[in-house]
């Protein structure tokens, strides 16, 4: 095998591994779309459960940093973590749960649902779409692609329209979510997107 073929094989393996990690990570994002339905039936118990999950994850991730593995949680974290998170505290799940909790506490149910859906589907599918189909990188966005941004736009457009049934509001929310997603916020987009989109939907639906 030539050096070029060997290098190509390594790159292909790295690409497949990154897609696998992205699928695991974004499947967790998408599952958060179930939370608004749970909140409808048991608001405070769900908030309490999310808080417990948040505290438990922080504790398990802290232990993992010190070489103590917590069954299931530490394994999922290692499987889903990005290369930039290796040997670091993986912050994504913390901001994900915080984003859901803060959105649910701040906004009325319909607006909170729209915000959480923007997180679950818009942000959840954007990076996956970018990795699978992204060819053109948008300047000054730390690697964000046109494909990823369009995925975010259409995901939020559809999910918000499913809730509010208003084309203008849905379009405004989708454009706003796409704009926020372009900002290189790192893991804090999990917090900013649902809170901001929930707040904007509150203003637009008055």
Give the ranges of each region predicted by the language model.
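Hydrophobic alpha-helical transmembrane segments
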Residues: 1-140, 145-206
């Amino acid at each position: 095998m030539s050096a070029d073929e060997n290098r190509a094989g390594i790159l292909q393996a790295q690409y497949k591994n990154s897609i696998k990690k992205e699928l695991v990570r974004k499947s967790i994002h998408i599952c958060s779309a179930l939370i608004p339905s749970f909140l409808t039936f048991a608001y405070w118990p769900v908030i309490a459960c999310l808080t417990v999950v948040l505290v438990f994850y922080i504790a398990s991730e802290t232990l993992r940093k010190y070489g103590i593995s917590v069954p299931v949680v530490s394994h999922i974290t290692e499987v889903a973590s990005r290369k930039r998170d290796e040997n670091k505290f993986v912050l994504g799940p913390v901001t994900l749960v915080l984003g859901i909790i803060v959105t649910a506490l701040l906004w009325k149910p319909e607006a909170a649902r729209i915000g959480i859906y923007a997180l679950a589907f818009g942000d959840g599918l954007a990076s996956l779409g970018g990795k699978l189909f992204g060819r053109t990188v948008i300047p000054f966005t730390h690697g964000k692609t046109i494909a990823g941004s369009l995925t975010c736009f259409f995901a939020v457009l559809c999910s918000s329209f499913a809730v509010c049934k208003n084309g203008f509001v849905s379009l405004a929310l989708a454009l706003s979510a796409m704009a926020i997603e372009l900002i290189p916020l790192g893991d804090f987009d999990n917090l900013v997107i649902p809170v901001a989109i929930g707040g904007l939907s509150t203003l637009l639906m008055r």
